[in-house]
Regions:
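A residue-level detector for the "anchor" residue at the start of short, highly conserved motifs
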Residues: 1-164
Length: 164
């Protein structure tokens, strides 16, 4: 089930953060003084207020996501070959961490898919009801293999489901 965490301290401009199962979010003790940066492993939903002097950046192993005042979802599990970023509202800038660096900007109802093996980012239209279904406790599968369905069920419920 989704976990909504309350984070202490002065986080002006960082309104909401919700973490999905098997996810972690870290930040430095001086968050917000000069920079607003967090590190994410797993899946999280953010609502962030725009601040041009202190951009909000989500770092993952492969991508940096600069928030330009927005709400968005990031799916970045280490075991998965594809990362996904879905924009609910506002605007985000996505930049690869590898060289040569590539940049894409998302508009609402778009999502970026980053293939970790090829390093290719693609952008496509999406229905954000599906992208944020986990926030409501729902699981949605479309054209998904049985092994991927079982992997998500295992993650969600913290169980092992045998499959051959």
């Amino acid at each position: 089930m989704p976990i909504e965490g309350k984070i202490g301290g002065d986080f002006t401009g960082w309104n909401t953060s919700k973490l999905n199962a098997e996810s972690s979010l870290s930040y430095t003790h001086d968050f917000g003084r000069e920079l607003r940066q967090v590190n994410l492993e797993g899946e999280a939903y953010f609502e962030v207020t725009r601040n041009e002097d202190k951009p909000f950046v989500v770092h993952t192993k492969y991508l940096d996501i600069e928030v330009l005042g927005t709400s968005f979802n990031v799916y970045s599990y280490e075991r998965e070959n594809v990362m996904e970023m879905a924009l609910i509202s506002g605007r985000i800038k996505i930049q690869t961490c590898s060289e040569p660096s590539r940049v894409v900007y998302l508009k609402p109802n778009e999502k970026a898919l980053f293939n970790k093996e090829s390093g290719i980012i693609t952008v496509e239209k999406t229905d954000n009801r599906f992208e944020t279904a986990w926030l409501r406790g729902d699981l949605v599968f479309r054209s998904t293999t049985l092994s991927d369905v079982l992997a998500k069920l295992e993650r969600r419920y913290g169980v092992n489901i045998p499959f051959e």
